[in-house]
Design a protein with these regions (language model features):
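N-terminal leader segment of winged-helix/HTH proteins
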Residues: 1-44, 165
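C-terminal regulatory/oligomerization modules of transcriptional regulators
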Residues: 1-13, 135-165
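N-terminal positioning helix adjacent to the helix-turn-helix/winged-helix DNA-binding module
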Residues: 18, 29, 48-49, 109, ...
């Protein structure tokens, strides 16, 4: 399989802005994953709600932890969790280590949705692998992880959030 393919608009230019390319890739993956939600009855969920469910399913289980991970205020994340709870996708339970905190847990419906989101993400990744090849995607993943997890030289003064409409 070819390690480089031309897109419908032509080959990627070496000088193409990396930030724009990353945002476009992220948006495409999010759109692809969210497209699976409508037929399953969850077309009303926002990208932030879907990502929150994925985080909870992967063990991030307090509003404070979720807010830090998502780059939101605890108040905003609390509202997102309230909507997910009202939709029957998560429960708030007493936290065993902190009486002031609540532990978030997926309901049976929340676990089903988590599994659907995880499968849709895996399908999107397979499509990317088919496009560029497994070795290229592995290299891209390693490069992104190295950059994402490296210390920032200076903390930004404001948080940056991408919005996918």
């Amino acid at each position: 399989m070819s390690e480089h393919r031309q897109s419908a608009s032509g080959p990627a230019s070496p000088g193409e802005d990396l930030g724009v390319l990353l945002a476009a890739c992220c948006e495409r993956v999010v759109r692809t994953v969210l497209a699976t939600l409508g037929p399953a009855g969850y077309g009303h969920l926002t990208p932030t709600q879907a990502i929150t469910l994925l985080f909870i399913g992967r063990g991030i289980n307090t509003v404070t932890q979720l807010a830090e991970r998502a780059g939101l205020t605890t108040q905003a994340m609390s509202k997102i969790c309230a909507v997910l709870q009202a939709d029957g996708l998560l429960d708030r339970q007493p936290h065993t280590d902190d009486a002031r905190s609540r532990r978030l847990a997926l309901t049976a419906d929340g676990r089903r949705l988590h599994d659907l989101l995880s499968q849709a993400g895996a399908d999107a990744e397979r499509a990317w692998t088919d496009l560029v090849g497994a070795q290229t995607l592995q290299t891209v993943r390693a490069a992104l992880a190295a950059y994402a997890h490296s210390p920032e030289p200076a903390a930004p003064t404001t948080q940056v959030r991408l919005r996918f409409t």
